[in-house]
Amino acid sequence: MTKALDGVRILDFTHVQSGPTCTQLLAWFGADVIKVERPGVGDITRGQLQDLPNVDSLYFTMLNHNKRSITLDTKNPKGKEVLTELIKTCDVLVENFGPGVLDRMGFPWEKIQSINPKMIVASIKGFGPGPYEDCKVYENVAQCTGGAASTTGFRDGPPLVTGAQIGDSGTGLHLALGIVTALYQRTTTGRGQRVTAAMQDGVLNLTRVKLRDQQRLAHGPLKEFSQFGEGIPFGEAVPRAGNDSGGGQPGRILKCKGWQTDPNAYIYFITQAPVWEKICDVINEPDWKTHAEYAKPAARLKHLNSIFARIEEWTMTKTKFEAMDILNEYDIPCGPILSMKELAEDPSLRATGTVVEVEHPTRGKYLSVGNPIKLSDSPTDVQRSPLLGEHTDEILRQVLGFSDHQVAEIHDSGALDPPRKAAAE
């Protein structure tokens, strides 16, 4: 079966997490992703957070599936020639270098366009144009500068970053959409273009509901926040609201049976207005259906703490899965707090390919997250990440059409090997 992006060739200069997230997704959809790596070193994450000695780390393997690896010294004259040929034959160049790195390599946008006018150059940066555009950005910096940290945590505590990698992986997903959109536009224009995704912008996009709340705040208190019911005044900016729901439907994380010893024995419970009477039945508070302080959503806002305290009395008598089974029968929105161990062992996630087991030649079997997007006509077959330089000769011969003699010349030039250090005097 053909894949959605069959025939699309990606020149992948990305590293660490944000860029590899993007190119891995494109590879899962069938693009031929050629990962260009520094000879002898490769992507820095190959050696970061290693759990086993002398093998590629899970940090690397889980972000670089379905790709091919070529090692290339782009400072070497022969290496520059090879890179020029790759630019000629590829559709997209993806990079997450610091500002100006491509220019210093000798391949600014104008030169790339002269080599291949159809090439799309896609970049991830920390910030867009402005006072911070030259600053180095990592995941947590992006969360802090994009509005996520200031609105995450509890009101009386410090800002918090989230466990979800919304800065790195989130921006990578944004860039992938931009690339596919640019490829589609190229079918009508016939030319390439630049695609840029800034990490600050990506995080802000994912926290847009907080920008919504910032504007609402100018017209009065945010009544769905628990501090409204507690009579605590709001300040000038959207506050941290703990586990209050951000969608206008009051919700909290509540303890379940076993919470004293299990750090994840909790459930998220939403008191959705259409099922309020069912909630009253479940927790055995039938009078709340008609009580003036509880019957209407607006009236309940001032009593959320006492309402959820009563609901928690009920959830603490059930395991999180027992509570979920009961609540689902009444169509009450809820969800158990699932640990990474529980997710890794969930058979339904294995069945859908959301969690996959991958065989690797040096580290053996490991688990990874598969493609979260399912296409009926382009199913994803997750293949292991490449070893460093594993496909170098294959790419030189099959993609660029070099002869054995030409490949030997490139090897002899040192373009595929670590730069030689000068001998000590």
Curated annotation (Swiss-Prot):
Enumerate the InterPro entries for this protein. CoA-transferase_III_domain, CoA-Trfase_fam_III, CoA-Trfase_III_dom3_sf, CoA-Trfase_III_dom_1_sf, Formyl_CoA_transfer
What EC numbers are recorded for this enzyme? 2.8.3.16
Q: Where does CoA bind?
A: 17-18, 38, 72-75, 96-98, 104, 136-139
Asked if the record carries the keyword Transmembrane, the reply is no
Which reactions are catalysed by this chain?
Answer: formyl-CoA + oxalate = oxalyl-CoA + formate
The entry's active site is 168
Entry keyword set: Transferase
Q: In which pathway does it act?
A: Metabolic intermediate degradation; oxalate degradation; CO(2) and formate from oxalate: step 1/2
Pfam families linked: CoA_transf_3
The UniProt record gives the binding positions of substrate as 247-249
Question: Which Gene3D superfamilies did the record assign?
Answer: Crotonobetainyl-coa:carnitine coa-transferase, domain 1, formyl-coa transferase, domain 3
What GO MF annotations does this protein's record show? formyl-CoA transferase activity
Self-association state and partner proteins as the record states: Homodimer.
**Record's function text:** Involved in the catabolism of oxalate and in the adapatation to low pH via the induction of the oxalate-dependent acid tolerance response (ATR). Catalyzes the transfer of the CoA moiety from formyl-CoA to oxalate.
Task: Give the similarity note.
Answer: Belongs to the CoA-transferase III family. Frc subfamily.
Mind telling me what this protein is named? Formyl-CoA:oxalate CoA-transferase
The organism of origin for this protein: Rhodopseudomonas palustris (strain BisA53)
